């Protein structure tokens, strides 16, 4: 442990604390996050997070340090401290000397040092994974939509014609109609004939064979395997199960990387004209949204990229953030740190690893509700409500372009990753229900806390199979789905997990979920009511903030915002059973408690079994993908 001497205002700095020479004002500085404890009425001890150092200082100095959380020049910090610290008796020069001393101690970090340390921590000489060379397959999730699959395969055939990569493709077919499954298989075979690519079809029969193969070596995981990968017997044809194909794709690519596509997507990727190079470090920045009159106009709203779209994404996954920001295309401009709180940039660690890439959408929104349209950034919001005619079209989000202008990194995303680094253990997701992508992201942040997702300033085409009235779901304000509840519960209620090994972390998380499943019926009911009250209150607060921030908004937008607030308010005050959106509408309190117990127990069982399943799949390697 390294202990440093006391810092005070209005006194000479001790000889043992060498002061850094005057720093040019263009540099920006922010204070590190840490823990403090009082020693006396005048002194305290401060320990930065992640170090064993302790620093003794006066309470006035600690207050000054607390006022330097955002990246600003030392002159700006000095002026702010003088204006906002009551009882401070120090000259500007004295304040500046203390700030210089804090810089020397490493308690104030410059923007340039922050970025430089990121590159060093990323290990510029270390060997990162090469997502492109370790690609196991481009996995396509398909169901009863042959027309959508035909469009996607046509765009992939054009990609292969241009780039001649003959990449491997796997079609994971969840179709319930025999005719649709047969048509999907025919389309895949025709794609293979026209491109020369290796293809693998994984339909119901092949999925059962995978379960049987893994169950032979891991018999204790048979029940979990069936739930993770197979459609439940007697389930409705329309029961959504995107997580089943997701889990199968993760097993098929264990030890390598994969690309995950849905059958209603299509190439090429498009980059907006105002896209910028580099990474935006602001954690509060949000993607922008543009609105168009038709699907065709939205699909062609930006120029197609000239690069290999898969190489673009695969070239990033598996790298540390430090290695990534050393590349000009992903550099972080230190000047863009101005005004950002250093404590909110903890995810920007040089040794953090990119486990997946995310991109925007042109065409239809990939959400089932339009609630997000009432949380747009000011520029997008102006386009959203431009006039009543376009507004009535825009609320359905059927012809939009959504995405970023500049790359961005984050720990959790609500959208399906495009490329995934699966060279090290990643978690499964819930095999049933919507929101499986968001839940996977939360689980990955627990399993691999050093991981990040990279959002790229490109968009992929999305053409839904039929028109959706998202506005009806928006204004009715339905309850959240189970996967969103589970993700929120894990982030807010599960205690910090200290284990380093990803498999151990999943086991610990499973214990927390079994704790929910084992709670009394009354406690589970109370848990659901508390969560629904929180979700409703948060939605109301955010909408109120939007409403109050736009006093001159069109009356039709204001009316809809009030309507959504009122719908959430009615749901907040009602005494109805605490139902989540995936559960039967006629269920009573007891049935809701029972479903919560069953669903959390099943997810716990899946997390317990998953590490062994993933490792066995990794050992099988190419033989796993070749299952027929």
What spans do the regions from the language model cover?
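Terminal low-complexity segments of carbohydrate-biosynthetic enzymes
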Residues: 1-20, 60, 66-67, 71-72, ...
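Long, charge-rich, low-complexity alpha-helical segments
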Residues: 2-9, 42, 50-132
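Long, low-complexity, charged/polar intrinsically disordered regions in eukaryotic proteins
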Residues: 2-52
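Short, acidic, metal-binding catalytic loop of nucleotide-sugar glycosyltransferases
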Residues: 154-166, 190-194
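Active-site-proximal specificity loops/subdomain of glycosyltransferases
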Residues: 180-256, 272-273
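Short beta-strand-to-loop acidic/aromatic patch adjacent to the donor-nucleotide binding site
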Residues: 256-268
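Conserved donor-nucleotide/metal-binding helix-loop-beta segment in metal-dependent transferases, i.e.
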Residues: 267-348
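Acidic donor-binding loop at a coil-to-helix junction in glycosyltransferase catalytic cores
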Residues: 434-439
